Amino acid sequence: MNLLVLDGNSIVNRAFYGIKLLTTKSGYYTNAIYGFLNILLKLQDTCHPDGVAVAFDVHEPTFRHKQYADYKAGRKPMPQELRAQMPVLKELLIALGYTTVECPGWEADDVLGTLAAACRDSGDTCFIATGDRDALQLAHGGVKVLLARTKMGQAVTDVYDEAAIAAEYGITPQALIQVKALQGDSSDNIPGVAGVGAKTALDLVQRFGTLDAIYKDLDTLDIKPGVREKLRRDKDKAYLSLDLGTIRSNAPIDAAPAHYAVTGGDPAAAVALFRKLELFSLIDKFNLDRDLVPGGETEAPAPAHQPERLTCVDADDLLTRLRKAGDVYVVPQMAEGTVTDLFFPLGDTVFVMPADTPEFGYFVRTLLAEDTVRIFGYNTKELHRLAQKQGVRCGNICGDLQLSAYLLRPSDAKYDLAQLALEYNVPVPAYRNSLDQEEPAVALAVILPELFAKTDALIDDAGQRKLLTEIELPLAGVLARMECAGFDVDKAGIEAFSKKLSTRISTLTDEIFEAVGHEFNINSPKQLGVALFEDLGLPCKKKTKSGYSTNAEVLEGLRSAHPVVEKIMEYRTLTKLKSTYCDGLLKVIDTDGRIHTRFNQVETRTGRISSLEPNLQNIPIRTDLGREMRKFFIAAPGCRLVDADYSQIELRVLASISEDQTMIDAFNSGADIHTATAAQVFGLPPEMITPQLRSRAKAVNFGIVYGIGAFSLAKDIGVSNKEAKEYIDSYMHTYQGVAAYMQRMIDAAKDTGYATTLFGRRRYLPELAASNHMLRAFGERVARNMPIQGTAADIIKIAMVRVDRRLYAERMESRLILQVHDELIVEAPEAEADRALQIVTEEMEHACDMAVLLRADGKIGQTWYDAH
């Protein structure tokens, strides 16, 4: 049989530290459990085991502590956030049919060693999964060690057997114990021989084999005198370390591989635990029946009648039924970004209106303009897109389940109906079509009303009704119309610019090759590192396991060391500009000559809107060449672009919500806030503030908004950490209201578990309760800056809704086409451009009443470049 043995403590630690803190609604941490079980699933896919054993350490001294009192001394205790998850993880593993093993007085490593030895004896295959290299000593006689590690920020698993260890270390797996005996192990506080490092220890074992061989002929072996003296001095410690580092194979456990065969476990208990932990996706990953309850029965609340699916052949008949219902629930079915069907649950019947029927356009126009019904949908932006294409405007959409779920759980990765059904404990009825095939979409459509009932109550409890109905719901329509409108582009101009970049890239390539002395792949960090640090001999300050680091920070530090570095930096900038922006944009120009981006309303935790396919919010502006790209975004013939941008909106929000009178007065007097801050922080009159001092004050201002500390600020503005700290301290002394606000926000978030904007948007912060200082500090930074960033995001959303309504109310042809952070762009007929600019700036400046007046700067141009 194939036996998979997991080093439970090692794997759970990797899971805990590798995944951001996750909590249930009640605040129970779940990230270690979630990560561990996902790792287990991947291991099963790799090894296809018949049996699984999960070995855990027992929280008590072992025989090694009796041998050496300082064994593992100094190890930090397990974080409480992880400790609390351990018993539940073990309970879940048993419920899922796995066997956990704990052996008092012994370590989990010894359980691994004992099971590995048993498999060797029985001829069974054994896979040991761990993150600890100590286990490599077991990789012989048919035992393979799956070593989990991190490479380039990604989790990878290396498979070790005797051949792999010989290739990497030049010795046998068993000889690795001898290496450890010499070099010691600081993580376990195993002493080794003081002054003998990993390189020397490995060399000694490669040449002489064992401690016994080394010490037998210590005086005559070819060993450096200094090393020989160290070996002689610490002989006892070397042998002690050998004993401590040797994994035993005789732990008193049931070592028969068959004992660890995976059983059926207790599926109902597992489902109940997954529900309690709100880890709904794992129910499906482990192929469990989501409706099971303890006792083995299937949950009863499923409808007595199974859903019926009826494809609509008469649009008027369905319209009559929907008018009679009054409250209409609808789920758009999507394929490749296009609506293929509309599903309408009425009781246990789901009426389907296919998009390819001749009556579809008439049906959509009639339903979405019908004032006698209220529409409650899922992803209603798609309904608005349908309406726009039919030349009507929806005025009867009263709810969107996806938006409600997002407001309630802004940190979730997805909000699909199946996930929401699990999260809110709504049973999904089974449905099979006439071909006896499952059709989940029909079953999910039936439960839409019940899901709405549950989320609506929670929205009201959270005080987010106004946020939903006055901002998010109408915004979905605005975004849909912007997507349909798109942005006109100069295709020929982009193509010409791409060719220009290609020419310059080719020239740079030749110059780089000439400087280095040979051709190589400039895009390969490994080859570039060799070229810079070996061929050219430039000073290397940062080297990783995979080679030399050649990131932007490293190259910036080498800029003055050799002229080729400047060329490499330019090469990188231009290749990114060409591939991502020029060539990337050319691929997505639609048949109408415009680019139609998609806006995601439910992605960011702060409430900001994101853009994708393509991401027009990432068009570069920091470099002259990057800004050139904006010249290719143009107004349609006979039109102009109206561009308005909030002036320092986040700082204005900060001044208002902190009630700092000094900052409020500076803004409302019309003073330049960065100059005013510089004058206060540096103790100089405004007229003596140089551009450099203003730039530093600007960095401090925005650093406060984004929660950066002295280290990051020092790096940004090129000063010492001490100077940066002095700037921040002086800032807080100047703006004492801001300092008090920061502390209030942290205290409030600790009390409630979340940070909130002026409009009630929440971001939950389990990190604030973390025992780990770094995690807790992160939570405090978010508690300080989320209300600022989130409120700014809410304000521009309000402005978008109002601009859209105003343009429509005044029967103008002008239309919003893009939002980028704090900037709105309207495409307007030439005759309407001035009026459109007036409307946009008015609505942006009056979107929210605060102590500091909002200001929007607007401009009109033929291209995005001209208008900005």
Language model features with spans:
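Active-site-proximal helix-loop-helix substrate-binding element of RNase H-like nuclease domains
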Residues: 99, 152-180, 187, 300-305, ...
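Conserved "right-hand" nucleotidyltransferase catalytic core of DNA-directed polymerases
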Residues: 234-358, 375-378, 395, 443-621, ...
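C-terminal polymerase-core module
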Residues: 503-510, 514-566, 733-781, 785-787, ...
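Extended two-metal-dependent nuclease catalytic cores across DNA- and RNA-processing enzymes
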Residues: 22-23, 73-250
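Conserved RNase H-like, two-metal-ion catalytic cores of nucleic-acid enzymes
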Residues: 3-4, 8, 14-53, 69-70, ...
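Function-dense linear segments that define catalytic or interfacial modules
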Residues: 344-348, 408-431, 440-442, 447, ...
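Conserved catalytic core of nucleic-acid polymerases
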Residues: 429, 484, 582, 592, ...
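Short hydrophobic beta-strand that contains or immediately precedes a catalytic carboxylate
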Residues: 5-6, 128-130, 329, 398-399, ...
